Structure formats: C-alpha cells, structure tokens
Amino acid sequence: SKEQFCNDVYCNENEIEEMIKGGMVIGGHTHSHRVLSRLSSKEQFVELQRSADYLKNRYSINEPIFSFPYGHIDTYNNKTLEHLHELNYHSAFNTVRGATCIIKSGKYELQRYDTVDLYPH
C-alpha cells in the first residue's frame, strides 16, 4: 500500500529527532512538495513559511536550510529566493551538479551532487 511504502521509505518524527540528536542537520522542502515556480508569490511564501514554522515549532530549528522540490532551476524563481531570505532560511540547495560554492552561486542556489551522480555506472 502507499501508506506502507511511505512508512518504509520516509523518516518518522522519532527518527528525525534521533538524527538531530546525532548531529545531523534537518532542513525544509516546502509544505506540500509543489513546483514553486508554478505558484503565485503569495502561495510560494505560504509553502515556505509553513515548512519553516513546522521546523521551528517541532524541532526548534530557527534558521533552516532548504532543498527545492524537484531541484531543477526552472522549478523556482527570483520570488522564491526573496522569500527564502525574508523567512530567514540559512541556505538552499538545487540539483545542479557541482561543488557547493557560495561565492559562485549565492547561498540560496547552492549546487550539489546527488548520491545517484556519484554511484559508479
């Protein structure tokens, strides 16, 4: 079932708390995993705010990092980046392959390598 699949694949709140206690950093990914560039500015703000509020209220994370849903540069826009700043997000990662460099990309468009990118083919 879909519920069983989600229980098997995704972390529950207890597992997240254990990860935080172990020193891992937990960040936001929006509230409902929608493509942000398809939303109005207000809808984007609400998505990002609900995610930030959840992290703050549930895990006391006041300056979360963010990972864009779907990650491609066409799935967010300049309004998204402005809202991340307004809501005090620490930084944000997209799925553009590359080493993280704040000077090159700015703190709200950090590149990264996905684990799939590093797997030998």
Where on the chain are the PLM-derived regions?
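Active-site beta->alpha N-cap acidic-glycine motif
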Residues: 1-22, 35, 57
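Glycine-rich, flexible loop/turn motifs
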Residues: 7, 32, 106-109
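Residue-level signal for threonine
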Residues: 12, 32, 77
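Structured helix-beta-strand junction loops
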Residues: 22-23, 87
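Histidine-centered catalytic micro-motifs
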Residues: 25-33
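C-terminal active-site subregion of NodB/CE4 polysaccharide deacetylases
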Residues: 38-121
